[in-house]
Amino acid sequence: MVVYEVPQKNRQKVVKYAVISYSIAIRTLGRAGAKYQKLLDSIRNSTVQPEKVVVVLPEGYSKPKEQLGYEVFVHCRKSMVGQRLAALKYIKSEYTLFLDDDISFEPDFILKLAKPLQEKKYDCSTGPLFSFFPASKAGTIAGILTASVSVSLFHRDMYVKILRSGGWSYHTFDTSEERYYPTESFAWTCFFIRTQVMRNLNMEDEIPWLEKNQYAFGDDRVMAYKLVKRGYRACIVSTALYEHNDAKTSTASTEIVNTTPPYCTGFFQIVFWHRFIQDDEPLKFMKVVNSFCIGYWMVSSFAYRLLKAVLTRGYWPIFNAVMRGIKAGIKYIHSDEYLQLPPIRY
């Protein structure tokens, strides 16, 4: 076995690791500036160096001035999902680390992510990002009441569990001790995966509906849950900590920030529920349960958001956007385009 050596801080011990065949794929608009530089510094300082770094930009966007000096730059049609997939054409490594342009991590980060895959226990891994969970008490209560997102009660051995409403439950944990937490969803900002598994997911099949509304809301949930549905396993490595510095280079206007995401929330919930939960359910009784769950989500979401619109100044546009998104989602799942989508399983 080929090994390389990394001295410990005390210089008295030497730890040996197997060489990891991996490449890095970065999705960027080339505008993250200092935050992108932090990512490049993290890559330079990584204990395990990648075989290749592929940087994917949308057509018409310039290369960032911050560079490693050996990366491959690729341009593709502007697409949040498409930019992820474009890098695969240039990668032959066994594993790929997919990154957004505003991530930073410690030198041993790759080693921690690769471990569960090399042990043949999982096919995809990433670190915990608790900042993506509801931060406020009001948000937590609203998520529970509408079956959108809640703290896990029955799946505390997992990081995220997808609910029959199309929502999800989550579990926070101690990050000081290494442990693998199975998960059915994770933030798409950073993940380490077997390259062939990523190809096998056929994520290009999901682009027609994920990017139908300018804003690829829920692409992370779709990718992770499709991975699970196709028989693969994903985990969170509790000690694989990283920083998401959120450059927010994709939110270009007030209209997109305030209106499009709420619309996409309603649209996504309906389509995701129908495609990944209802259509994939073989038991008729559970289909009835699923229908009750999404019905509850729609009624409770309407009631909660209506009350918030009455009590909160300026919330009516968001309320209307969510309701329009739900209506559009219901219409879409009966469209020819949707009915022609390939099945999520093989």
Predicted segments, located by residue:
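Non-catalytic, C-terminal membrane-associated alpha-helical segments of glycosyltransferases
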Residues: 263-265, 280-346
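Short aromatic/hydrophobic "clamp" motif used to bind/position activated sugar donors
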Residues: 96
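Short, acidic, metal-binding catalytic loop of nucleotide-sugar glycosyltransferases
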Residues: 38-50
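Acidic donor-binding loop at a coil-to-helix junction in glycosyltransferase catalytic cores
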Residues: 186-188, 209-225
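A recurrent flexible, glycine/aromatic-enriched loop bordering the glycosyltransferase active site
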Residues: 81, 157-193, 215-216, 256, ...
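Glycine-rich, basic loop-to-helix element that forms the pyrophosphate-binding segment
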Residues: 75-91
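Active-site donor/metal-binding and catalytic loop motifs
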Residues: 204-217, 230-256
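Conserved donor NDP-sugar-binding/catalytic core segment of glycosyltransferases
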Residues: 108-156
